[in-house]
């Protein structure tokens, strides 16, 4: 479906911005009390730079609505599905923790909508807003480099890695995963993700997973036809790890029906939050 709407929603991965700012800059403290503020400063600089650059975009690419989406606690509903989900992650740095609230206040000071919801990840909120926009044929650009969000890319939804000034559309997703966005979930389910402690099928990487999905069409079809796969080792590992693959699919699939209470109603022209 062609994009017939004049609206263009930009969904900013706020948590991604925070950690990029934290690790990219040397420690910085407030002179008056020693409060760590390096991530706050870096986040604000990144957001301001992005807002300024977005003003110079062509009209078709210029955002009409903004929202910054945050994670909340480390644990969420995925830990109920698989208790080891992200269990390998290091604890949040102590000097970063007190900066979270100031970053949220900074977003408010920019008069941009900040959204978070307990028990869900930022990616799920982004997926939900993207789904709502798609139903209204509204163009969406997701400001993030997170590969887990690439399953959302389609004709009206794009990604932008502002740190690398890299545009991510359907072809860029295919270049990375070997499949188009609508099959990314299936590839991730087979390959797993060590950074999130998602098991996948042992010995199956992105390249092999893409070959299998391109051959059979879906994760379920791969598992149904596992016994017919010619390579003995690959055949056996698929037969032995069906449950892991199916659990992995539940983990990598972003929820598109999160009960968000805040509408996307931030005016780009006035940078002012308002209710619709």
What are these regions (language model features)?
Residues 168-193:
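A short, charged helix-loop
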Residues 269-276:
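Conserved small/polar residues in nucleotide/adenosyl-binding loops
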Residues 194-249:
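Accessory alpha-helical DNA-binding modules that contact the DNA backbone or grooves
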Residues 10, 143, 189, 199-203:
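Short conserved micro-motifs on helix faces and helix-strand junctions that flank
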Residues 25-32, 191-200, 230-239, 261-268:
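Short, solvent-exposed helix-loop connector elements
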């Amino acid at each position: 479906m062609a994009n017939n709407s004049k609206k263009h929603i930009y969904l900013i991965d706020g948590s991604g911005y925070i950690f990029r700012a934290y690790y990219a800059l040397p420690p910085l403290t407030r002179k008056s009390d020693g409060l760590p503020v390096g991530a706050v400063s870096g986040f604000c600089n990144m957001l301001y730079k992005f807002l300024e650059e977005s003003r110079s975009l062509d009209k078709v690419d210029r955002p009409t609505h903004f929202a910054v989406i945050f994670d909340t606690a480390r644990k969420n509903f995925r830990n109920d599905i698989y208790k080891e989900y992200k269990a390998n992650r290091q604890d949040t740095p102590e000097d970063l923790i007190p900066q979270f609230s100031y970053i949220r206040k900074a977003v408010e000071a920019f008069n941009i909508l900040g959204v978070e919801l307990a028990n869900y990840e930022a990616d799920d909120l982004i997926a939900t807003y993207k789904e709502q926009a798609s139903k209204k044929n509204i163009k969406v650009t997701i400001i993030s480099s997170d590969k887990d969000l690439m399953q959302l890319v389609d004709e009206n939804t794009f990604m932008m890695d502002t740190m690398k000034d890299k545009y991510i559309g359907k072809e860029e997703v295919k270049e990375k995963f070997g499949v188009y966005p609508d099959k990314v979930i299936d590839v991730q389910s087979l390959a797993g993700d060590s950074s999130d402690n998602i098991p996948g099928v042992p010995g199956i990487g992105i390249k092999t997973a893409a070959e299998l999905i391109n051959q059979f069409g879906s994760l379920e079809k791969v598992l149904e036809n596992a016994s017919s796969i010619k390579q003995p080792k690959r055949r056996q590992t698929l037969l032995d790890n069906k449950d892991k693959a199916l659990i992995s699919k539940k983990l990598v699939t972003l929820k598109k029906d999160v009960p968000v209470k805040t509408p996307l109603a931030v005016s780009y022209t006035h940078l002012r939050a308002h209710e619709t």
